[in-house]
C-alpha cells in the first residue's frame, strides 16, 4: 500500500546535549529508515557553508606595506600575524562592517583583549594570541571586519583590473561560525518497529553562535529552499508578493526560556514582557524603572542575552510579527 507524506514518522522533539559552551550533540529521533542520512548530510552542508558570521577582511599595519614584510620587535612575521587574526571570533550587532584598532608596546603577548572595539562589536575569544613583542617592539594596526557567509577570497572583493590600495593587506575570509560538524545515524525503535533512524549531529562553533541556534538556523534555510516543491502542482504563474517579515526565531521564544531567576522573570511579566523580542527592545534605563528590578537583575538579564547574541536596546522593525497575534499573548499571560 502506498504511504502518504502524513503517514511517515516524524520526530516529536529535539534533544540537545551540551558538551561545552561551544560544542553540543543534537539528537533527532525517530526518523524513517534513510531519512537520517538525508537530513544529516543536508544540515551538515548548510551548517558549514551557509550560516552568517563575521571575519577580518582587511588590515593596515603601521610601517608595513605588504604581507611579506617584517616588523622590528615582533616575534612573528606578517604572514603569521595575519593567520592569527583569522582566528578571532567576532560578533557584529546591527551592522555589516566595523573597524577595530590596536596599539601595543612591548614586551609581552598581544591578545584579542588588546583590541579597541566599537560598542556594537564583541570578540568572544579575548585570550586569543595575535603576536608577541620584544622590549623594543610596538604594534599599531587597524582591522576591517565584515559580515558574510561561506568562504570569500580577497580577489573576489575587487573587480578585475582594479588596483589594490597599498598598505591595506587583504585577507581571505571564512565567515562560517561553525568550526566542526559531523553526524552519525544509529538505530532507533518505536514499539515493534526496529527499522528506524536516530540522527546524532555533533558540532562545535567558534563561540559567536549557540550550537542549538545554529541547528535551528540551518533547518530554517533548508525549509525555505525546499518549500517551493510542496506547491509543484499549483499554478506556477508568478505573482507579486508582499515582503515577508523576517524575524529571528529566538525572538519568538518566551522569556521563560532564558531561565532567569524567579525575581527577574516576575518583574518582566509585570511589565507585560512575555517574549524575548519584547525584552531586547527595552533599554537599561527603562528596565531599571521597573519596580523591584535592580542592578543585579539587570546584569543577569544582560549576561543571558549576550550569551545568545542579543542585547538590550535593539530595534526590531517588524515586531510584533503577524504570526504573534494578540490572542497568543493573552494565552501566554493566562498560563
UniProtKB/Swiss-Prot annotation:
Molecular function as annotated in GO: DNA binding; DNA-directed RNA polymerase activity; protein dimerization activity
Cited function: DNA-dependent RNA polymerase catalyzes the transcription of DNA into RNA using the four ribonucleoside triphosphates as substrates.
Region (Alpha N-terminal domain (alpha-NTD)): 26-233
GO biological process: DNA-templated transcription
Subunit structure: Homodimer. The RNAP catalytic core consists of 2 alpha, 1 beta, 1 beta' and 1 omega subunit. When a sigma factor is associated with the core the holoenzyme is formed, which can initiate transcription.
Cellular component, GO, one term: DNA-directed RNA polymerase complex
Protein name: DNA-directed RNA polymerase subunit alpha
Keyword Transmembrane helix: no
Region spans: Alpha C-terminal domain (alpha-CTD): 247-335
Family in the record: Belongs to the RNA polymerase alpha chain family.
InterPro entries noted in UniProt: DNA-dir_RNA_pol_insert, DNA-dir_RNA_pol_RpoA/D/Rpb3, DNA-dir_RpoA, RBP11-like, RNAP_asu_C, RNApol_insert_sf
Catalytic activity, EC: 2.7.7.6
Keywords (A to Z) from UniProt: DNA-directed RNA polymerase, Nucleotidyltransferase, Transcription, Transferase
Pfam families to which the protein is assigned, alphabetical: RNA_pol_A_bac (PF01000), RNA_pol_A_CTD (PF03118), RNA_pol_L (PF01193)
Top-level lineage group: Bacteria
Domains as described in the record: The N-terminal domain is essential for RNAP assembly and basal transcription, whereas the C-terminal domain is involved in interaction with transcriptional regulators and with upstream promoter elements.
Catalysed reactions, semicolon-separated: RNA(n) + a ribonucleoside 5'-triphosphate = RNA(n+1) + diphosphate
Organism whose genome encodes this protein: Acinetobacter baumannii (strain ATCC 17978 / DSM 105126 / CIP 53.77 / LMG 1025 / NCDC KC755 / 5377)
Amino acid at each position: 500500500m502506498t504511504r502518504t507524506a502524513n503517514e511517515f514518522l516524524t520526530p516529536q522533539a529535539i534533544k540537545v546535549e551540551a558538551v561545552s559552551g561551544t560544542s553540543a550533540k543534537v539528537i533527532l529521533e525517530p526518523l524513517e529508515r534513510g531519512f537520517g542520512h538525508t537530513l544529516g548530510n543536508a544540515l551538515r552542508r548548510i551548517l558549514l557553508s551557509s550560516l552568517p558570521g563575521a571575519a577580518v577582511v582587511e588590515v593596515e599595519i603601521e610601517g608595513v606595506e605588504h604581507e611579506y614584510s617584517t616588523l622590528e620587535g615582533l616575534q612573528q612575521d606578517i604572514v603569521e600575524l595575519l593567520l592569527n587574526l583569522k582566528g578571532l571570533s567576532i560578533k557584529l550587532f546591527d551592522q555589516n562592517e566595523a573597524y577595530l584598532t590596536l596599539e601595543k608596546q612591548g614586551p609581552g603577548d598581544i591578545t584579542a583583549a588588546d583590541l579597541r572595539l566599537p560598542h556594537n562589536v564583541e570578540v568572544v575569544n579575548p585570550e586569543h594570541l595575535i603576536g608577541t613583542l620584544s622590549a623594543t617592539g610596538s604594534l599599531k594596526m587597524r582591522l576591517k571586519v565584515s559580515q558574510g557567509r561561506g568562504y570569500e577570497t580577497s580577489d573576489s572583493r575587487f573587480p578585475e583590473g582594479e588596483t589594490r590600495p597599498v598598505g591595506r593587506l587583504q585577507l581571505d575570509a571564512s565567515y562560517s561560525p561553525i568550526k566542526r560538524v559531523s553526524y552519525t545515524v544509529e538505530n532507533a525503535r518505536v514499539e515493534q518497529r526496529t527499522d528506524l533512524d536516530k540522527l546524532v549531529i555533533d558540532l562545535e562553533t567558534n563561540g559567536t553562535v549557540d550550537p542549538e541556534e545554529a541547528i535551528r538556523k540551518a533547518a530554517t534555510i533548508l525549509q525555505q529552499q525546499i518549500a517551493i516543491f510542496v506547491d509543484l502542482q499549483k499554478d506556477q504563474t508568478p505573482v507579486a508578493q508582499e515582503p515577508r517579515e523576517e524575524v529571528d526565531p529566538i525572538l519568538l521564544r518566551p522569556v521563560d526560556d532564558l531561565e532567569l531567576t524567579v525575581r527577574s522573570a516576575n518583574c518582566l511579566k509585570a511589565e507585560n514582557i512575555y517574549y524575548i523580542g519584547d525584552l531586547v527592545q527595552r533599554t537599561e534605563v527603562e528596565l531599571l524603572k521597573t519596580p523591584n528590578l535592580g542592578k543585579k537583575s539587570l546584569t543577569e538579564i544582560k549576561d543571558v542575552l549576550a550569551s545568545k547574541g542579543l542585547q538590550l536596546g535593539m530595534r526590531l522593525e517588524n515586531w510584533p510579527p503577524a504570526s504573534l497575534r494578540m490572542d497568543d499573548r493573552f494565552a501566554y499571560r493566562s498560563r
